[in-house]
Amino acid sequence: LTMQTAIGQGDTLVSPMYMAMLTSAVANGGNLMTPYLVEKIESYTGTTVKSYTPKIYKKLMTAQEASKLTELMTGVVEKGTGSALSGRGYTAAGKTGTAEHGDASSTTPHAWFVGFSNVEDPDIVVSVIAEESGSGSEVAVPIAQKIFDAYYNN
């Protein structure tokens, strides 16, 4: 059971939001940020009524640890299971996952991808889970690609 938990199998349960927060800590040099959904509120005339700024919740890892994870996650995109994201006009770092659940012999695994773009000065984090759909590289990465592409092409 312990080894299954260490590789994300068995009884390990996490939400896409939780995984996005952990990934943002890597992207932010080890700082776990307080999540927020609204950047600013504007009046009907376009005047900013209230704006919100990113806040550090706590230090989750050292800058060196975050840098090493970024390097490894960049490798996943450049030459690994996330390679569909390479050469798209932005840099990305990420990790795919294919999570077995239930009776693994009779169910289709959950497809995961977590990552961030503009590696040197990160812009956004994306967390995708497609339940009972297959592998992370075949299902979750193309979904993440559409999100990143929409962000940079709008």
What are these regions (language model features)?
Residues 1-56, 64, 73-154:
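Active-site beta-strand/loop architecture of penicillin-binding DD-peptidases
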